Amino acid sequence: EKLLNNVNMILPYAFSIVDSIGALSAQSLEKYALATDRVLDSKISLCLHTHNSMQLSFSNACAFFALNLKRNLIVDSSLYGMGRGAGNLPTESICDYLNQNYSKEYDMPLIYSLLDTCISHFYKAFGWGFSLKYYLCAKFGLHPDYALYLFKTKNLPLGLSSKVLRMIPDDRKDTFDISLIENLCKQVFEETKN
């Protein structure tokens, strides 16, 4: 509440609820959004920014709009869900949903054209989106760089990746620690040899 009172003194255009890991449940989102709405000045827009590690971005955005809060709501999205790792909420999905369910008038042919002309080559070059390794990081509450390391550097099978990720201690989950993950990988490799 103290944070929101300070935000009210600044009176920014918007305040965001952010799911950095991509594991926010609809129930938790509702709890945070309603608690924020009670304290946040009504002139401040409420924004939702989600990562799509567990494929929850779209359902959480729909749940956010369904709360029918009496303020301006913003949902952050990107074309084709472009974003680091598992990506973000796809603009094309949420705009189509808002057109169908809230009488919005987003120009879907234009959005699809942008996907073809501006985004598809980035996707081919860099890739992003659902990956079981990012899913596991979200499930275990870990920084997504752990998945990136296992995927790009170690190329571990999912079973071994899961074992390594489960071994990360609670106090080391929020920040990527390369020496920790390397030691855990060595430990798992040694166990599989025996």
What are the residue ranges of the model-derived segments?
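Catalytic cores and adjacent flexible loops of soluble metabolic enzymes
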Residues: 1-194
